[in-house]
Amino acid sequence: MNKFILIPLVTLNILFGSAAFSQKPVASFQDWGVYSSNDPKLCWLASTAMKVENTRGGKPAMNVTRGDIVLFITYLPEKDILGEVSFGGGYPFKPNQMVELQIGSAKYDLIPEGGFAWPANSDIDTKIRVSMTRGSTATIKAESTRGTKTKDTFSLRGFTAALKDTKKRCGV
């Protein structure tokens, strides 16, 4: 398995496997929540989509079932994960088709694996985080294994403050 897939899967296993994701935020900054857990030390900020659009054949799709739609930034210092960007779309993504993240005029490809997607490397993570501190919204476009096209929009209000708080909590 590729390193760019293995590390995010380890992170998500910790987040979801430990029920850490279901906990309440330790801090909130407008549209972003900050979370942390110990053993191992794990800190992340997350936001849910403020607008969700689902289409099939170019028309609005009404009967679409999706799980949680979340944009994350994760810090797991023990595994040298320092600001990893990830997106949970609430459904399995179409294999071998990039997920597109747009912040302002900047566009980034995210690599899908099951129902999650990540940038290919930490350099792209850094570029995305910088764009997020400067932008007002982040829009993610993807397609499900069933052919449903989705467009999820996230507010970036409070992102910069939440990012600073998360890094402080994780000592990075």
Each language-model region and where it sits:
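Positively charged n-region of N-terminal signal peptides that target proteins for export
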Residues: M1-F4
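A generic "folded-domain core" signal
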Residues: F21-V172
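Bacterial N-terminal signal peptides
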Residues: I7-F16
